[in-house]
Curated annotation (Swiss-Prot):
Protein name from the UniProt record: CAAX prenyl protease 2
Keyword Mitochondrion listed: no
GO cellular component: endoplasmic reticulum membrane; membrane
Reactions it catalyzes: Hydrolyzes the peptide bond -P2-(S-farnesyl or geranylgeranyl)C-P1'-P2'-P3'-COOH where P1' and P2' are amino acids with aliphatic sidechains and P3' is any C-terminal residue
InterPro entries, per the entry: Rce1 (IPR039731), Rce1/LyrA-like_dom (IPR003675)
Keywords: Endoplasmic reticulum, Hydrolase, Membrane, Protease, Transmembrane, Transmembrane helix
Gene name for this UniProt entry: fce-2
Record-level GO BP terms: CAAX-box protein processing
Compartments where found: Endoplasmic reticulum membrane; Membrane
Annotated site, Transition state stabilizer, chain positions: H216, N220
C-alpha cells in the first residue's frame, strides 16, 4: 500500500476504531461510552504512529521529529497558539465580560466541575490530542511528502471534516430526525473543514504537534464566534464595543499568521 493511500486511511481508521469500541453505545455523552471511545482513540494513535513512522523512513531519518514530536522551541509551541487563539476569540471574551460570565474562567470550583466531567475531558483534552495526532501529526505529515504541502492543506481536512458525519447515528439514537442530523452535521463539515485546513497549515509550518492540539482545544472550548449575536444587545455602547473587539481580535489573528511573530520553527 502506497504512502498516499495510507495517509488517507489513517483518519478513517480513527473513526472506525472509536465506533468499534463503543459499538453497543446509545449515547456518545454517556461516561461509559466516552471511556470506551477513549480506548479506541488511543489504539488508533498507537497504530497510526507506528505505521506513519514506518512509511516516513523513506523520506527522513527522524520520523518522530517529522511528525512533530519534539522538544526544541517547546515554549513557543505553547505560547504561540495560545496567543493566536486568544486574539481570534477576543470578541468572545469581551462578550462574556459584558454578560458577566467571564468569571467562570477564574473560579476553582468551575474548573473542578470541568475536570470531573468525562465529556469535558473528551472535548478539551483527549479529543484534541488523539485527533490531532492521527489527522495532523500522522496523516498530514505523510501526505505532504507525497502530494506536497499545498495539496495536503486542501485535501487532508476532508476526511477530518467528513469524520463528523458519523455523529448522525448518535443523533438519531438520541431522538433527532435524519434530516435534522444531516443538516447539522453538514454545517459542522463546513467549519471543521476550515479548521482542518488551518490546523494542517500549523502542523506543516511549525512541525510541532502541540501547536494544532492547543488550537483545537481552544476552538472546542469556545465554539464558533458569536458575532451574529451582537445585534441582540440592547445597549449601543455594548454593540460598538463588541464589533470593535471582534474586529481587533481578527486583525491581530491575521497579523500573527501573516508575520509569524512568535511562531516556533523546526
Amino acid at each position: 500500500m502506497g504512502a498516499g493511500l495510507v495517509s488517507a486511511c489513517l483518519p478513517i481508521s480513527y473513526v472506525l476504531l472509536v465506533h468499534l469500541f463503543d459499538r453497543n453505545g446509545t449515547d456518545r455523552n454517556d461516561p461509559e461510552s466516552v471511556k470506551r471511545r477513549f480506548k479506541g482513540a488511543l489504539l488508533s494513535n498507537f497504530v497510526s504512529i507506528v505505521v506513519t513512522a514506518f512509511y516516513l523512513r523513506d523520506y527522513t531519518d527522524s520520523p518522530m521529529l517529522e511528525m512533530g514530536v519534539r522538544w526544541d522551541n517547546i515554549g513557543q509551541s505553547i505560547t504561540y497558539p495560545f496567543i493566536l487563539m486568544n486574539a481570534f476569540y477576543l470578541g468572545q471574551f469581551v462578550m462574556m465580560q459584558i454578560d458577566r460570565t467571564l468569571w467562570h474562567y477564574f473560579d476553582w470550583y468551575e474548573w473542578k466541575l470541568c475536570f470531573n466531567s468525562w465529556v469535558w475531558r473528551r472535548d478539551i483534552i483527549v479529543g484534541p490530542i488523539t485527533e490531532e495526532i492521527v489527522f495532523r501529526a500522522c496523516s498530514s505529515t505523510l501526505m505532504a511528502h507525497v502530494y506536497g504541502p499545498t495539496m495536503t492543506i486542501l485535501l487532508n481536512p476532508i476526511p477530518f471534516a467528513a469524520s463528523h458525519f458519523h455523529h448522525i447515528w448518535d443523533d438519531q439514537r438520541r431522538g433527532y430526525s435524519l434530516a435534522h442530523s444531516i443538516l447539522q452535521r453538514g454545517f459542522q463539515f463546513c467549519y471543521t473543514y476550515l479548521f482542518g485546513a488551518f490546523a494542517t497549515w500549523l502542523q506543516l509550518t511549525t512541525r510541532h504537534a502541540i501547536v494544532p492540539i492547543i488550537a483545537h482545544a481552544f476552538c472546542n472550548a469556545q465554539g464558533l464566534p458569536l458575532w451574529l449575536e451582537i445585534p441582540n444587545y440592547p445597549k449601543r455602547r455594548d454593540r460598538l464595543t463588541l464589533y470593535a473587539a471582534y474586529s481587533v481580535g481578527f486583525a491581530a489573528f491575521v497579523h500573527l499568521l501573516y508575520t509569524r511573530n512568535g511562531m516556533p520553527t523546526p
